[in-house]
Amino acid sequence: MSNVDHAEIAKFEALAHRWWDRESEFKPLHDINPLRVNWIDERVNLAGKKVLDVGCGGGILSEAMAQRGATVMGIDMGEAPLAVAQLHQLESGVSVEYRQITAEALAEEMPEQFDVVTCLEMLEHVPDPSSVIRACFRMVKPGGQVFFSTINRNPKAYLFAIIGAEYIMKLLPRGTHDFKKFIRPSELGAWSRQAGLTVKDIIGLTYNPLTKHYKLASDVDVNYMIQTLREE
């Protein structure tokens, strides 16, 4: 059975043409992207690395990592976001290889091929997140690193990520997230360890509604990112 939620794919298909509009529903992704890329780059030095971006969507993260000197492949199951990503790189001049394939299928085809694997804001949109994590482990080289980001599952996360972001501040379209699919750090850590990855670091991402700015912080109550290592 394919680890794909077609309703989730359809959500992003409908919005794909606005992916690179910095004032659209994707503004939060554009705003947090520099913070995330810097955090990753500080830990792995992206220049010269072979990187896989799982759940790449329209290519915001993929392009940013390529601009840092990485050789990037982006994969997604959404046809429209991938078409947008491919068109945008013609405009930006940034080279990324995009493919419509699941992480699990690519893991069969390309085991131990990547220095770095990123899987950001994707795990909460698939039926079986642990399956994606296992696939990421298989695709990263021994000694390589895998980065995940998602949203915590607790009352504060519900208040901020759904009520606040989707209904009050309208940062995201209503229905973007399903609270039941949010993932606690303890769960993400356990799935990573079960897959064979060692958790090295965790960082939170907070939003100030007054300044409308995001920053990295120790607070992992809502959005957070983890760094994991496949030991040699």
UniProtKB/Swiss-Prot annotation:
Top-rank taxon:
Bacteria
GO terms (BP aspect): methylation
What InterPro entries does the entry give?
A: SAM-dependent_MTases_sf (IPR029063), UbiG_MeTrfase (IPR010233)
Molecular function GO labels: 2-polyprenyl-6-hydroxyphenol methylase activity; 3-demethylubiquinol 3-O-methyltransferase activity; polyprenyldihydroxybenzoate methyltransferase activity
- Pfam families for the chain: Methyltransf_23
Which keywords are on file for this protein? Methyltransferase, S-adenosyl-L-methionine, Transferase, Ubiquinone biosynthesis
Which pathway does this chain act in?
Cofactor biosynthesis; ubiquinone biosynthesis
The UniProt annotation places S-adenosyl-L-methionine binding at: R36, G55, D76, L120
Q: What is its EC number?
A: 2.1.1.222, 2.1.1.64
Catalysed conversion reaction: a 3-demethylubiquinol + S-adenosyl-L-methionine = a ubiquinol + S-adenosyl-L-homocysteine + H(+); a 3-(all-trans-polyprenyl)benzene-1,2-diol + S-adenosyl-L-methionine = a 2-methoxy-6-(all-trans-polyprenyl)phenol + S-adenosyl-L-homocysteine + H(+)
The record's listing under NCBIfam families reads: UbiG
Function, as annotated, reads: O-methyltransferase that catalyzes the 2 O-methylation steps in the ubiquinone biosynthetic pathway.
| Family named by the database record | Belongs to the methyltransferase superfamily. UbiG/COQ3 family.
Q: What is this protein called?
A: Ubiquinone biosynthesis O-methyltransferase
Q: Which organism is it from?
A: Pseudomonas fluorescens (strain SBW25)
Q: What is the lineage of its organism?
A: Bacteria, Pseudomonadati, Pseudomonadota, Gammaproteobacteria, Pseudomonadales
Q: Which gene encodes it?
A: ubiG
